[in-house]
Amino acid sequence: MTYPGYSFTPKRLDVRPGIAMSYLDEGPSDGEVVVMLHGNPSWGYLWRHLVSGLSDRYRCIVPDHIGMGLSDKPDDAPDAQPRYDYTLQSRVDDLDRLLQHLGITGPITLAVHDWGGMIGFGWALSHHAQVKRLVITNTAAFPLPPEKPMPWQIAMGRHWRLGEWFIRTFNAFSSGASWLGVSRRMPAAVRRAYVAPYDNWKNRISTIRFMQDIPLSPADQAWSLLERSAQALPSFADRPAFIAWGLRDICFDKHFLAGFRRALPQAEVMAFDDANHYVLEDKHEVLVPAIRAFLERNPL
């Protein structure tokens, strides 16, 4: 299948035995590195406009998390071979394995969206000095704000067995997000590209496991890592940050944006009343040149 606007050649790396991650490595090998991390239920396709707008000068690294996009989608049953546990810590470890493989030990720009924030800032806990610039879009690096209720659409998948069945049977989360996660309707071919990797029950495993891994309390497996990321977030206030936010997002809404503003008061912010969760779909014509200008104003 071809994907509109995605004229790139993915590469593959076994991040653990028998489990391969698909990723992009676009742009000059000696260019300033921009690591772009997607969330759920998207994949690296989310970043295509930014890759196209930066890769003449910048080295763009764009992984598809395991179970997502063009990466392998292993089972997590106890007897599965190979087996993957679909936890936040495993996502962080996978990212570290990829960047080690690519020899990226110098300064980077960390660009994040959705779960990409928790993965990226989780990785940054042990690579703080490498992260020199931040590009933050509709994401989190701290627990659910107390004033923010969990959207029922997310709670359904996280808490209810019926929700898991519905998501895995009908691709409800990926398909729904392609309609409801934008303010400007996606062209049909773009919408198909977003949902194509999740074309059967087996291939939808990660879209539900991400939801079930959302840390809401200390009893949850990912809580400790997220809490440490939250504690470390203000320590990034000494370096350039760019925040782009779609204010119509039902999940990562104004409460999450406010959390980032408090932690990173130096950040340049572009918040859009008429943009949604996939802010790079709704506003890529504005954001791609704005992000490039931000990088050029703040060279590594």
From Swiss-Prot:
This is Cis-3-alkyl-4-alkyloxetan-2-one decarboxylase. It is found in: Cytoplasm. Its main location: cytoplasm. Belongs to the AB hydrolase superfamily. One of its GO terms (cellular component) is membrane. Residues 33-282 form the AB hydrolase-1 domain. It holds the Pfam family Abhydrolase_1. Keywords: Cytoplasm, Lyase. It catalyses: a cis-3-alkyl-4-alkyloxetan-2-one = a cis-alkene + CO2. Its EC number is 4.1.1.114. It comes from Xanthomonas campestris pv. campestris (strain ATCC 33913 / DSM 3586 / NCPPB 528 / LMG 568 / P 25). SUPFAM superfamilies: alpha/beta-Hydrolases. Gene3D superfamilies: alpha/beta hydrolase. Disulfide bonds: none annotated. GO terms for molecular function: lyase activity. Homotetramer. Forms a complex with OleC and OleD. Involved in olefin biosynthesis. Catalyzes the elimination of carbon dioxide from beta-lactones to form the final olefin product.
